From Swiss-Prot:
Signal peptide start-end: none
Organism lineage string: Bacteria, Bacillati, Actinomycetota, Actinomycetes, Mycobacteriales
Pfam family, one: FGGY_C
PANTHER family in the record: GLYCEROL KINASE (PTHR10196:SF69), SUGAR KINASE (PTHR10196)
Binding site for sn-glycerol 3-phosphate: T12, R82, E83, Y134, D249
Listed GO biological process terms: glycerol catabolic process; glycerol metabolic process; glycerol-3-phosphate metabolic process
Assigned keywords, A-Z: ATP-binding, Glycerol metabolism, Kinase, Nucleotide-binding, Transferase
Regulation of catalytic or functional activity: Inhibited by fructose 1,6-bisphosphate (FBP).
Name listed for the protein in its UniProt record: Glycerol kinase
Family annotation (CDD domains): ASKHA_NBD_FGGY_GK
Pathway: Polyol metabolism; glycerol degradation via glycerol kinase pathway; sn-glycerol 3-phosphate from glycerol: step 1/1
GO CC list: cytosol
Length: 505
């Protein structure tokens, strides 16, 4: 058998290809950013053609840099930013419109209408999700209602819908010359259109959004011994690689962190924060603002479910300090600037740029920096930004404990912000539990590689994956209980100030 497995990680701000060996160690990678298109306040788009070009480039470059051929790869996995939605023509491959990103809030009226007339309760029961701008169903409805000619093409079977996993897979396997139109259960579970029990598109839910079933991809398991397809020889890989794993990015991180047992949880720090708790084969409904979602499904096995707390803006808040405020020139400077002060100086930053996600689900909220006085400096704002990342995670951890009845004992973490030592120390302080980072912090790509490799026998099972996991760093809490309670009370007060800012019809 070939000695390596590759993964494409199509994220919110960049696309990367990573190659792993049997020990789960990285042997090569290449990464490219793509443009964030912001046409109106609250609107966030990506260019699908640019995403595909970046995908092809990172795959080819990673192979060339490691001097590997497609025959050296046992399989290829795909992981992706979830919910981001696009539609393209099956005959030409041309997108009808830019991809509407998961952070985009243009569908707030669609989401609000669903809740007002009672359809929201049906969506919660069947799909495990609250009506929100976050999810794909409303985005697809908006596209069908606002893009000229799309409704007719969808009815004729000429228009295809997908999240970015489906778009990448379709192009890798031939595009308009026979590309495979498939998604996996984890991505489908983020649309408000899939029934969690049947793992299929639900006709009643499709009717709520007036979406033709024929434009939707086939739903398959997250790890499939029968490949979804193979990369075409004329494509960027310059050869055939079986594509056998697909996972939404946060579910991929669960697999990469080897959170395969009931009660295991992880927090991924990226553009947003995403904390997932494995609930096993049981569908657990949340009473505290969390989502019920599919964690993964391997082959013919029963699906494994999870509770999730999704936070819209965390890492992107640091980007905002750089790109909009201009108080840092790079993300790493957020730590050095924040270290110039010992605390937040009474300043709290609630980065509700797209409203608030879990556990609040308030699209009427908007960002605010509160508690400012003439005493405060850029350093206090930087510190408040790092604290906001951690306090939002505390909100979700508390909700998760309320739903599960099990308090968190240790938090596994991964993602880019875990390189920020101060932020991770604050996270331990805010939660009052140890925070643990694995040696391989980019667990999203690793999880996609695991899903693909398990399908072809590159890894035999969960024990192989557990043997690969190694602790890389641990942070223990240093705050007193009084300090922790006082800080969190200030955060909750700040959150309250951001609500009811935008009128949502």
């Amino acid at each position: 058998m070939a000695d390596f497995v590759a993964a494409i990680d199509q994220g919110t701000t960049s696309t990367r290809c990573m190659i792993f060996d049997h020990d789960g160690a990285e042997v090569g990678r290449h990464q490219l950013e793509h443009e964030q298109i912001l046409p109106k306040a609250g609107w966030v788009e990506h260019n699908p053609v640019e995403i595909w070009e970046r995908t092809g480039s990172v795959l080819a470059t990673a192979l060339n840099a490691t001097k590997l051929a497609t025959t050296d790869l046992a399989a290829l996995g795909i992981t992706n930013q979830r919910e981001t939605s696009l539609v393209w023509n099956r005959h030409t491959g041309r997108p009808y419109y830019n991809a509407i990103v998961w952070q985009d809030t243009r569908t707030d009226r669609i989401a609000s209408a669903l809740d007002r007339d009672g359809r929201g309760d049906v969506i919660r029961r069947k799909a495990g999700l609250p009506p929100a701008t976050y999810f794909s169903g409303g985005k697809l409805q908006w596209l069908l209602e606002n893009v000229d000619g799309l409704r007719a093409d969808a009815a004729n079977g000429d228009a295809l819908f997908g999240t970015t996993d489906t778009w990448v897979l379709w192009n890798l396997t031939g595009g308009h010359r026979g590309g495979v139109h498939v998604t996996d259960v984890t991505n489908a579970s983020r649309t408000m259109l899939m029934n969690l029990e049947t793992l299929d598109w639900d006709d009643e839910l499709l009717g709520f959004f007036d979406i033709p079933r024929q434009m939707l991809p086939e739903i398959r398991p997250s790890s499939s011994p029968q490949p979804y397809g193979v990369t075409v020889e004329t494509g960027p890989a310059d050869g055939e690689i079986p594509i056998t794993g697909i996972l939404g990015d946060q579910q991929a991180a669960m697999v990469g962190q080897v959170c395969l047992d009931v009660g295991e949880a992880k927090n991924t720090y990226g553009t947003g924060n995403f904390l997932l708790l494995n609930t096993g084969e049981k569908i657990v409904r949340s009473d505290n603002g969390l989502l019920t979602t599919v964690c993964y499904q391997f082959g013919d096995s029963k699906p494994v479910y999870a509770l999730e707390g999704s936070i819209a803006v965390t890492g992107s808040a640091v980007q905002w300090l750089r790109d909009q405020l201009g108080i840092i020139s790079g993300a790493s400077q957020s730590e050095s600037l924040a270290r110039q002060v010992d605390d937040n100086g009474g300043v709290y930053f609630v980065p509700a740029f797209s409203g608030l996600f879990a556990p609040y689900w308030r699209s009427d909220a908007r960002g605010a920096i509160v508690g400012l006085s003439r005493f405060n400096t850029n350093a206090h704002v930087a510190r408040a930004t790092l604290e906001a990342i951690c306090y939002q995670s505390r909100d979700v951890v508390d909700a998760m404990a309320a739903d599960s009845g099990v308090p968190l004992e240790v938090l596994k973490v991964d993602g880019g912000i875990t390189a920020n030592d101060l932020c991770m120390q604050i996270q331990a302080d805010v939660l009052g539990v140890d925070v643990v980072k694995p040696v391989v912090a980019e667990t999203t790509a690793l999880g996609a590689a695991y899903a693909a490799g398990l399908a072809v026998g590159f890894w035999e099972g969960a024990d192989d994956l557990r043997a690969n996991w190694q602790e890389g760093r641990r942070w223990s809490p240093q705050w007193s209980d009084e300090q922790r309670a006082e800080g969190y009370a200030g955060w909750q007060k700040a959150v309250h100030r951001t609500l009811d800012w935008v009128d949502v019809e």
